[in-house]
Amino acid sequence: MKFVRCALVVVAGMWMWTAIASAQMTAQKPDVPVDKWTGKTILLIGAHADDDALSHGTLAMLQAHGNQVYILTLTTGNVGTQDPKLSRTQLAEIRRQEELAALKDLGIPGDHYINLGYDDGLLEFEDRKAVVENLVRWIRKLRPDVLFAWDPGKNYQRWHKSDHRAAAYLAADAARAAMWRLLFEGQITQEGLKEYMIPEYMFYDDFDYQDENVWVDISDFVEKRVNADAHYISQFGPGWKNYNPNPSEAEVQQMKAQALDFIRTRDGARIEGFRYYKGLPDAIGK
């Protein structure tokens, strides 16, 4: 009988969490519009040093409005080139410097950039538990009010290329794990951290916009986004195949023009779109 009672308690507890999560599945919008956010801690988790580019206008706006923006990159980006002259070590350092230059143009401090150092292109094959534990540690340290990440998908697994796909699910799994005291409890008992539940999420994608429910007007921050994007010399334009740390003015202007063309327009405004979610991490994909 005692076993039965315990089993019923466990089932009831699981049902309660599921019921709460289910109640939060409907489409949402933030209580306060994104352009009015202030005093928040923002954490973006991405796979590569340019993944945040899709949100650069929003991130620049949030930093300018008195929020603290942090960028966490899982890999060093040490594979993403077609230039045979570059080694992994060289490319990793190039991409780090490009990211720091981009963040400077956005107004985000350099010490708000975190790189976990995993190899580019192989994120899916890393020790998943170790990666999630590392992410949980940073979530518990920074205690973000909002997490930006690749969209893991709503009601289905969203297609991304490998590292983006891995980053989407690693971020979601870490958000869930961070709230449970007995998961990675050494961080709490030995490192002085505390469990933490992220209350709000902003998920993004590069081409699939069907699940978006929030569009941020970045018209006043387009120049910052374009200038920041132009620092990714090794990734965009001719630098991907033939890296030159000092591109010509014509090449820089071409990169800026491409960056501007990539920014979407909605109702006459330059925008960035997101799938906003607020609630328990268990229902992120619902």
Where are these regions (language model features)?
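Hydrophobic transmembrane signal anchors and adjacent membrane-proximal interface regions, especially
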Residues: 4-10, 60-63
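Metal-dependent de-N-acetylase/amidase catalytic core
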Residues: 3-6, 23-45, 129-286
